[in-house]
């Protein structure tokens, strides 16, 4: 994990154990005493400055503003000891295929609160390269960071090709792997594979019911695919079919947002790339190549149990998953069953009453253990841990007192006096806020149903001592590609509402006393970083640069402009081209931003 720093800047220093080491600090020359009494400084005006507790009591993890002072006569503002985290973003070389459009580089990640970016020499249209400059300025337009990177535009030969050979054996099962060899071409020579051995099977849940199947690849030895994740190697990779999403870029859009939010800390979001897939010599369409959701030193960095290790002090990857009972190891957290989730409205006599919050029932949820398990003790251990973290959260927002977990994962009285300090000592709240922000933007229909990941590591070398949320996944039914009333439209709050498959963790977060002020800060940083604009630019680039590949895909599958079970909205019937589907998505995202700008202004 990055070096951490506990900085006691007035009441902002709330033992934020998730704070990253700041790499640059900008302080004013004026000197103020760090208490709540009246301050004065002739450097701004002759009036008295009063410590603004409303501005400072709302904790912010992304960037510490320092203490804010406001003149109670003229309204002038003063920040003392502001510090900026310059580790949450990057400005790196980027290659584009020639598509006739201008291309620019942007800083990728979270630009510190209050900072702005100015670019120089940052536009290229024709084949060639150019070095661009990005300058980051603070609120006083003082330079705090300078980065350079190159734009490359190269000849457009379409998507990379992945060629899979199973010796003509069919790939039809989720349970049974089929031996294969895999080759890649139409890519940089250093990324070419020639008959790499391994296995392949189908994957997915609802997506398995479609004609175009998604796949999981498992190489015999660790292998990199097409340079993803900085060239890191792993055995397991996935090919997402994107059959239910006629834009075929919703997962790529969510991955862009997730990488911008998570991948400059020790959290994780999959890398990705659109590719053409050939199976036994036959074209099988456009897929998105992505990384398997797993414990790995270059993916989710938890210390998974070694083979036959039955100890409990290991790392655990957990998925909130309504189909968890289909997994080898799973457990439930919470009370009561929402029988409306089942066909026919339910059965049996489960009389257990669910917990309630603001009059809303928080029904029991199932969780699958996605890391290797070698004893029932391990399952019991992580179940007890997650159950008590959940109830510490619930009790805090329900008004039942503040609790933390002891060394035996039992609930005990919190040593802290605030909700934030208490919850942040057992949950990485920064990770929860970032996941909340991503799902709030995308309106993912399955946010409380499945493909929702969290992890914790009890080993001595753990990077995740607290419960951490991350590894966002599965967004084909999101961002307007859903026929339910709560997900189809681009307006209104989503994760804080008790609608559809709502997520109990997000619902509880939205009821904390620090949520409103803190989320506005995260949203402000997200907005200022122009992350959504980058995701929209990516969607448009894919549509233009790979136009011929998408045309070929729809010639193969002929599902454009048709309704795919189970959520496709009627507007999909109007799509005459792949570009139509992309235009609908980018307009929805733009409108979503306008709505959230008003809600969280």
Model regions: which residues?
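Thrombospondin type-1
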Residues: 32-87, 128
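Serine/threonine-rich, repeat-prone extracellular segments and beta-strand-based repeat modules
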Residues: 49-70, 111-153
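Conserved NTP-binding catalytic cores of kinases and kinase-like/nucleotidyltransferase enzymes
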Residues: 91, 147, 153-253
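Internal "kinase-insert"/substrate-recognition segments embedded within catalytic cores
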Residues: 223-224, 234-243, 265-268, 283-434
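Solvent-exposed, low-complexity, repeat-rich "mucin-like" stalks and linkers
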Residues: 82-111
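Short, well-structured beta-strand/strand-turn elements
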Residues: 261-276, 444
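Middle-to-C-terminal accessory/interaction subdomains
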Residues: 170, 196, 204-206, 210, ...
């Amino acid at each position: 994990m990055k070096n951490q720093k506990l900085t006691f800047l007035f009441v902002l220093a709330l033992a934020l154990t998730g704070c990253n080491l700041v790499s640059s600090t900008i302080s004013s020359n004026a000197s103020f005493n760090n208490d709540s009494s009246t301050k004065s400084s002739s450097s701004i005006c002759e009036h008295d400055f009063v410590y603004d507790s409303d501005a400072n009591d709302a904790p912010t993890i992304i960037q510490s503003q320092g203490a804010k002072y406001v003149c109670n006569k003229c309204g002038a503002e003063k920040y003392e000891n502001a510090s900026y985290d310059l580790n949450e973003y990057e400005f790196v070389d980027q290659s584009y295929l020639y598509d006739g459009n201008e291309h620019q580089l942007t800083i990728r990640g979270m630009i510190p609160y209050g900072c702005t970016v100015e670019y120089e020499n940052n536009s290229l249209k024709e084949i060639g390269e150019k070095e661009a400059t990005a300058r980051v300025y603070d609120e006083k337009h003082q330079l705090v960071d300078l980065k350079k990177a190159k734009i490359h535009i190269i000849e457009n030969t379409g998507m990379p090709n992945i060629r899979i050979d199973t010796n003509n054996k069919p790939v039809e099962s989720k349970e049974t792997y089929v031996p294969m060899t895999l080759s890649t071409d139409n890519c940089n020579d250093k990324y070419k594979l020639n008959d790499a051995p391994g296995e392949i099977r189908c994957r997915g849940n609802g997506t398995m019911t479609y004609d175009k199947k998604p796949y999981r690849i498992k190489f015999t030895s660790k292998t990199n695919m097409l340079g993803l994740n900085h060239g890191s190697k792993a055995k397991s990779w996935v090919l997402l079919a994107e059959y239910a999403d006629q834009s075929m870029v919703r997962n790529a859009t969510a991955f862009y947002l997730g990488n911008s939010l998570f991948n400059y800390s020790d959290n994780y979001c999959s890398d990705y790339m659109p590719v053409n897939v050939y199976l036994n010599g036959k074209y099988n369409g456009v897929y998105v190549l992505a990384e398997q959701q797993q414990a790995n030193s270059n993916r989710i960095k938890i210390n998974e149990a070694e083979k036959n290790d039955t100890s409990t002090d290991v790392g655990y990857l957990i998925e909130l998953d309504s189909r968890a009972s289909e997994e080898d190891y799973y457990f439930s957290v919470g009370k009561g069953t929402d029988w409306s989730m089942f066909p026919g409205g339910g059965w049996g006599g489960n009389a257990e009453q669910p917990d309630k919050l603001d009059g809303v029932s928080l029904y029991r949820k199932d969780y699958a253990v996605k890391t290797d398990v070698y004893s029932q003790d391990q399952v019991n251990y992580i179940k007890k841990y997650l159950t008590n973290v959940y109830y510490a959260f619930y009790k805090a927002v329900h008004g039942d007192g503040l609790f933390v977990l002891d060394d035996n994962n039992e609930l005990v009285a919190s040593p802290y006096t605030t909700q934030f300090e208490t919850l942040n000592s057992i949950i990485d709240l920064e990770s929860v806020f970032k996941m909340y922000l991503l799902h709030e933007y995308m309106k993912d229909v399955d946010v409380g149903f499945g493909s929702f990941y969290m992890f914790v590591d009890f080993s001595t070398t753990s990077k995740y001592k607290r419960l951490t949320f991350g590894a966002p996944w599965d967004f084909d039914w999101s961002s307007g590609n859903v026929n339910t009333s709560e997900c189809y439209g681009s307006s209104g709050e989503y994760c804080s509402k008790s609608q559809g498959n709502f997520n109990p963790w997000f619902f509880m977060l939205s009821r904390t006393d620090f949520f409103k002020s803190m989320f506005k800060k995260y949203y402000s940083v997200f907005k200022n970083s122009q992350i959504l604009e980058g995701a929209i630019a990516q969607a448009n680039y894919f549509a233009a640069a790979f136009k011929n590949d998408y045309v070929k895909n729809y010639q193969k599958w002929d599902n454009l402009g048709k309704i795919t079970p189970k959520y496709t909205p009627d507007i999909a019937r109007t799509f005459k081209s792949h570009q139509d589907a992309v235009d609908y998505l980018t307009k929805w995202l733009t409108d979503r931003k306008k709505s959230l700008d008003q809600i969280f202004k």
